[in-house]
Structure formats: C-alpha cells, structure tokens
Amino acid sequence: MSENNNKIPSFGLKSNVNSTYNHLETVAKLSIDEKLVNEPPKFVDIKTITPLNVENNGIAQKRIISKRDLRSFHTSSTYSELLNFIIQLSLDIQGKSLKSNFTITKNINSIIVLLNQLDQYITDIPPKQIRTRFGNESFVEWFNKVEKETPKLLFNLINDNPLNTPITNEVPIIYNEISTYLQNSWGDKQRIDYGSGHELNFICFLLCLVKIKFIKREEYELLVLIIFNKYLNMMRRLQESYWLEPAGSHGVWGLDDYHFLPFLFGSSQLIEHKYIRPKSIRNDEIVNSSFSDEYMYLGCIRFIGKVKSGGSLLEHSPMLVDISGVKNWSKVNEGMIKMFKSEVLGKLPIMQHMFFASIIQYIDNPDIIETDEEINQRKPIVTHSFSSCGCINRVPSMFAVANTDKILASTSTTTNNNNNNITSGDHCNDNEQQCSETHNHDHNHNHNHNHNHPPPPPQQQRSYFPLD
C-alpha cells in the first residue's frame, strides 16, 4: 500500500516524524499478556461447532449482570481475545490513510455488499413526520427489517452465495448467533438510541467472522479502513435520519455523543504523520480540508463541527480540545486504548448488554466472589417499551436539537389547537398516566411490561483521558 502524504499540502506545518518510536511495544503492555498481544483468536469450525442457547434458537444472550460477572469476564480468555483484537486492528492501520491503494478481497467485498443492502433499507424506510426530539419511530421499522433479513443475508454471505439467494430450508441456528451482534450494532429499537456498546457489538461481529476463518489476519486493515468506516458512515446516516438518542452520553465531557472507536483507530492512522499533530484539530483549515476524508479522527472533528454549529469546539467538546494538547499521536492512541478499557470494557452499564454464546463465550471464574457491597448495589437492568418513556433524564439527538427551530415552526399551529395533548418524548402516555417530572426515586409503571428504574446518574459524568 502506498501513502500520499507527500502530495498533500502541509499548511506550513513542520515534519512530525519520529522513526525511533516502537508503538507495538507500548500498546502491548496494555494487553492482559503483552507476549500474546499479536496472537490470533481461537478459531472455530462453523460447520461442526455445537451451538449454545439452542432453546433460544441460538441467539446470543447477555451474561454480565453484576460487578462480579464483569470482574469474572475480565479474567477470561474471551476478554483478552477481544482486547487483543481491537489492539491488532489499531496496529494494522498505523500510518495508513482511508485513501490508500487497497486491494479489495472477495470476502471483504461480500461484507460491503451486505452493508449496502442494509443501507438501502434506510432509503426504503424514510423517517416519519412526527413531533419529537427523542427518536423517530421509523427506526423501529428499519430495525425489524434488519432483524428479519440479517440471518439469511449472513448465511448467503458466509456460504459464498449471491446475497439475495432464496433460502428454502431454515437457516442453521449458528447464523442466528452471529446475526445477534450485527443486528445489535445499530442501536436499541426500544429506546431508539445508540452508544459505544452498540459500536462494540459491531467489533464482536467482525471478531466472529475472524474466528470462523471468514476473515484473515492480512485483511485486518481492510476491516477498519473499509468495513468499519462504511459502518461509521451508515451510523451517521441512521443518527441523522432517525434522530437516534445518544446512549449514556457524558455530555460535553465525552469524546463524542455516539462513538469512541473512530478516535482510537483514527489516532493510530495519524501516528508519525509528517504534518498533522494532535493540536491540528483546532485548525479549521486543516479540519475542513481533504485530510478529513483520509483520517477518521479528523473526519469526526469535522462532523462534530458540522452538526454542533452552536459553539466552538472548546464549548461543546472540551475533552477533545484537552487531548489536542498531547504531544504526539502515539500517546493519544495509547490513551485511547486505556480509556476504551476503562470507559467501555470496564463499565457495567455498557458491558451488561454484551452478548455471549458459542463463538464468543462467557467463561465464568468461580474464584471471583461477589462482595456484600456488590450484592447490595445490584440494580435491575433498565428496559423500556419505547423511547417516549419519560422515566430518565435523556439527552435529545443532536440532529433534533439542530432542527428545533424548524420543528417548532412546523408544529406551532398544531400545538396551539391541542393544548391538552402530550408531546411524545416528554411524558409517558400509556393509560393516560404521566411519569413524575422529578424522577428522584425508584418507581414502577406499565408500558405493556412492568419495569423498574433506579435513580438516574448525573446527566454529565466527566471522563478523564489517561496520559500516564
């Protein structure tokens, strides 16, 4: 592969190359066992593997319920395998542009065709014209379509059939297991939201393809620079079309309302770049140049500036500005991996939604004992029947916020004529009951299924970027 950095204008920046730095040695120490950081995952034979969860038609299940379960997971080979996979993906794209001269392999192209099919469903299912800042109901229709079609599409993909080949017999249940990860990569259809846990599901989907030997190690760079980048662009389209809420947003004290991995992978792309430094994200000329088409990190900054036009980067993304003060991209990438371990893989609210079955297994460690404090702190997993549940302090889609004036103008007449109506996304309206507006205590109410909510966490929880 060739790079075109010398053909791109430098904007007057000085060379930033440090050829003595060994990034592999640095990030290997972030693995569970640095000697195994480059080891391949445990492979399985999709034709002979014994599926788990047969009683649930092979669909992968959630196994991390408590802090004890999460600590047990962190001691397992599955956790090490997942973390190493992410580190390997990052290492394999170091210094490489999205515009590099790729040779697209047959299986990578098959995944592109599959994603294009799911992308077409967005075109086929336009958003409904409704009055809400908290997600468009058409996302549920799109999600249901994806759930229905994904097992068949994956079966044809993995068995080298044309994607839309009719399937006369029932799809083997192992494909339902793999489908679970891809289906849950797009967000939550009940809450109509999206966050880093859904992004992690897409990585698990790619890991499944590696473990069944559909993808080879030499294709890892294509998984990120082509497949993950395609996924990222699809997610932006979904977020913009259906106004997905950010799940578990840290507000201004987070990297991004929705994503984490584009910053991790994107920082690796920029390691030892001749001109672009971390502080370059504060230069509008660079951010709005062709560099943002080549590097995910800069592309994220440009996208944030586009959709959050109400203030400067410092005002709406101070953490990104803080990170821009780091000396070089290798330290940024190292910090991103540390932060991903602590803020994603180390957080129960995210990891309790991770799926396990026969390909990606939950391996319990009986030596990990749940403490009395952890037992007392146990809370039920929060579930919702629909996004209009008003039981928690939710963050509206930034796309909805950007279009507030347009919505208010188009709905003002209707609002004046229907003063007694309840706006979707502001209150619960099942059985004409409204949720308490204070939400300062546990409560129950009926949304076709009873569910409990503990007190909500602070709306903005600051994350810290690890530099040491």
From Swiss-Prot:
Q: Where is the composition biased (Low complexity)?
A: 412-424
**Coiled-coil ranges per UniProt:** none
Entry function:
PPIases accelerate the folding of proteins. It catalyzes the cis-trans isomerization of proline imidic peptide bonds in oligopeptides. Acts as a regulatory subunit for PP2A-like phosphatases modulating their activity or substrate specificity, probably by inducing a conformational change in the catalytic subunit, a direct target of the PPIase.
Provenance organism: Dictyostelium discoideum (Social amoeba)
Keyword set, alphabetical order: Cytoplasm, Isomerase, Rotamase
Q: Which GO terms describe its cellular component?
A: cytoplasm; nucleus; protein phosphatase type 2A complex
InterPro entries per UniProt: Phstyr_phstse_ac (IPR004327), PTPA_C_lid (IPR043170), PTPA_sf (IPR037218)
- CDD domains the UniProt entry points to: PTPA
EC number annotated for this UniProt entry: 5.2.1.8
Q: Which reaction does it catalyse?
A: [protein]-peptidylproline (omega=180) = [protein]-peptidylproline (omega=0)
One GO MF term attached to the UniProt entry? peptidyl-prolyl cis-trans isomerase activity
Q: Report the protein name in the record.
A: Probable serine/threonine-protein phosphatase 2A activator 2
